[in-house]
Amino acid sequence: MASLTHIDAEGSARMVDVSDKAATTREALAEGRVAMAPATLELILSGNAKKGDVMGVARLAGIMAAKRTHELIPLCHPLMLTKVEVEVVPDSALPGLHVTARAKTTGQTGVEMEALTAVSVACLTIYDMAKAADRGMRIEGIRLLEKSGGASGHFRAEPPTD
C-alpha cells in the first residue's frame, strides 16, 4: 500500500518538497453532477433563474476556484496553471447538469486538486443560484476521471457502476 505523502515520520502534516522533481506537463480531468427536478433544469436552460445565467456563472466560478486551490486546501502547492476549462452540460436523463473541469500546467506537481476544486465550486455555484427554485438538488459523483504527467504516470477512472 502506498504511504501518505503529506504525513511525516512523526505523523504530522507537512507540505511535500517537490524541489528535486522535474517539471513536466500535467493534466487532470474531473467531473461532478447536480441532480435536480426537471422544472429546475428547464428554468436554468430558459435563462430565467432569478440570479441570472446559472451555467455561465458556474463555469467562471470553477475557473476562479481552480486558481485559488492552494488557498483552500492547506497542503496544496500554488501552481502556475496554463489552462483551466470548465464545461456545464444539461443532462435530461439525470435530470440536472453535468460539470467537467480540465486543468493543465507544466510543473513539479499534479493538477488533480485544481480540477476537483473547479468541479466542486461550479456545482456549489449551481446549487446556490438555483436553490430558491429547488432546495432538494443533490451534488453527486465528484471524482477524478483522468490524470497524466509526473512520476506516477497516467490514471483513468473506471466507469461508475451505479
From Swiss-Prot:
One of its GO terms (biological process) is Mo-molybdopterin cofactor biosynthetic process. The keyword Lyase applies. It comes from the Bacteria. SUPFAM superfamilies: Molybdenum cofactor biosynthesis protein C, MoaC. The keyword Lyase applies. The active site is at 128. Keywords: Lyase, Molybdenum cofactor biosynthesis. Its EC number is 4.6.1.17. This is Cyclic pyranopterin monophosphate synthase.
